[in-house]
Amino acid sequence: MQAILLYSMSHMILLVSYTKSIIKHLLHIGQAKKKQNIKINQSHGGSGKQAITVINGIESDVVTLALAQDIDAIASSGKIAKDWQSRLPHNSAPYTSTIVFLVRKGNPKNIQDWDDLTRENIEVITPNPKTSGGARWNYLAAWGYALTKSNNDEFYAQQFVKSIYSNVKVLDTGARGSSNTFIERKIGDVLITWENEALLAINKIENHNVEIIIPSTSILAEPTVSIVDKVVDKKGTRAIAEAYLEYLYSPVGQEIAAKNFYRPRDKNVAIKYSVQFPELDLFTIDKFSGWDEAHKKHFSQGGIFDQLSKR
């Protein structure tokens, strides 16, 4: 997940890339509340890596990351309050996405659902869930589909997901690398990706020659946000940091999210963008008893992903 660093003499705020459109509003908030100018710089990195930089000392006022687990890790370091997820609506996830497929124009391999990704003649592109937070949503979307299909048969789900990853042609370290592999290098038949990334490719990349396939069932991907309590209290920036996060939930903030291909929480904005975001059957991380349990079971050292990825 791309990120942006905003800072002035006393401000540094970590933001996901779509929030470039909110920067001018953030500047207004900062000037109104603190009468300070805010300088803008950019930094790019995955959710997990950004969390580590905050844990290791970068003084970010706000984090907006792909996984609640990454913010939990910062909270475990003592820099964010343990109850961070209850401080804002929707468990501090102001917008959502889901997991879809990108295929070649015309869908020559006739890929329609998760089952098709297990076929022997299909080359799959997806990032490594051990190194990419976003890729963990991809993996769990496939696992959840298999559980739904098999009446919660864990062995079936493991074999199903193993079949998909056996077809992975390139296992990049991050989502952007996988997108480049599929779209720019033209490797693979199908890319498992976040819906916002797929819509970005369709709408913003010239001569992309790809199209979106919506699976029958997927997962509700919920990027989460929080102020970094120790930093904002040290710098006296709690007011502007909280105002920024609250702005993400406002009608204007929700509109900006939708324009940048994230699913808005605001019902009125969602109705306006209903054509862009078709309804589909979505399950949540609760299907896996939360991120702590999902990580221990699937992505820890020696976990299920390590087991099934051995070839």
How would you describe each model-predicted region?
Residues 2-132, 274, 309:
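N-terminal segment of the mature folded domain
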Residues 10-12, 103-105, 123-150, 164-168, ...:
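Short beta-strand->loop
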Residues 14-21, 25, 49, 53, ...:
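Extracytoplasmic/secreted proteins, especially bacterial periplasmic and envelope-associated proteins
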Residues 56-57, 92-95, 105, 116-119, ...:
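Extracellular/periplasmic catalytic domains that process cell-envelope and extracellular macromolecules
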Residues 98-107, 222-239, 256-260:
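A bilobed periplasmic-binding-protein/Venus flytrap-type ligand-binding module shared by bacterial periplasmic
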Residues 106-112, 131, 144-152, 231-239:
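Short helix-loop capping/hinge motifs at secondary-structure junctions, enriched
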Residues 150-216:
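Ligand-binding pocket segment of bilobal, Venus flytrap-like solute-binding proteins
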Residues 232-311:
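Extracellular/periplasmic juxtamembrane helices and adjacent flexible linkers that interface
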